[in-house]
Amino acid sequence: MAVALIAKDILKRIVVESVPFSLALKQAFKRNDVSKEDRAIASAIVGCSLRHYIVLERLFKDAYPELESEGIIAFAIAFSNALFIKKLDQDECNALAQYFLKEEELSFADFLAPYLVDKKLVPEEVEIGSFDFLSCRYNTPVNVIKMWNKQFGQMTTSRILKANSKPAPKVLRINSTKISDEDFFNQYPEFEKTDLDGVVLYKGEGRLKNSVVFEKGLAYPLTPAYKELLDDGDVDLLRGFAIYSEYQNDLTDELLARFDNINNIEYIAGSYSAFISTKNALAKANINGVNVYEAGVSSIITCISKPVHTFLVMPDSSRLNLLQVLPDYFLRFDIQKLDELIANQAQALKEASAQVEDGGYLLYLVDTISKKETMGLINEFLKEHQEFTLVRDKQYFPYKKYGGSYYFAVLKKGDND
């Protein structure tokens, strides 16, 4: 039962204590002497429990109204092993769940039995196609589904949810400073060309992280949003490039793939964690030509000595791209903070725009699908700053070829001819 108990402890830390998934795993495996095989099993059961948590919690609460959070967590571990993972002794998992039930209550084994025959998890009383149904089926908060439905319509919302429930496409950015596209495809036929130069899809059968292209630094897993944004944003390091970001991101990989020499960049990290992660990423890549500052959005002006040609703004957002990437993100997303995020995004654009030279570019990138944080925000900015014009914007959807939930906008200051 040791692995089941460890999995329960991990899930409890994630659900009750709000510890991020990867950190909870790391800490648990550090505290316990667990084999590589058992680590994989525990990780799989916890991940599976999280991917079905909304519907599982509903099932358990409907059957056992007095069941508390730790009991729900134990149920989720036992249930996920029985229906999906099937690696642990089920009698031991049942005993783990049974511990949280009263003697007169239906046993966990009897509760579980019907689902082993009919694996339909969404309760019959939930109307098919309703917001509650979609939430249970796709493990997505109802308020997010309602927002998407209002902004994009029922069909697009359904396509987003279906895509998010599947693994994202394996998209990579070729390191153009080390190898040409032609040589890359000649040497590595397991990668497929796309309509974007320098962007490929992995179609091999082996695990992508074991590919030799990583070892040689020839390609990086990276959304093409970075490449398209910087292509259209006329990034010229000699003329000045500034970045404001409030979260850890993969921009360093795009810079490595694009420039032989990376210098004359002012990088403003909007939080201490972003500052540390940026410094570490640059050090790991042996990049020395980037000046990194820690400053809030209202202090951007103090970090820029003169206007730059291109200013990239990556403020915090609802980050709904993470619904597909992280199994626990649905627990951490708080729609009540959306207005606060939008106000901060608007301020970041305003502060950065003042540091763009005439003829220069203001770039905006967020990893989310939310019109108020994307097209709506940019339209409001353009109304108030008529010296800027929109060159291009794009919303990435997870159901399209490259996957992901990113939005970028390229704005030019002054004459756009």
Which residues make up each language-model segment?
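Glycine-rich S-adenosyl-L-methionine
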Residues: K146, F330-A354
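C-terminal catalytic and target-recognition region of SAM-dependent MTase-like enzymes
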Residues: V297-L320, Q324-V325, D339, A346, ...
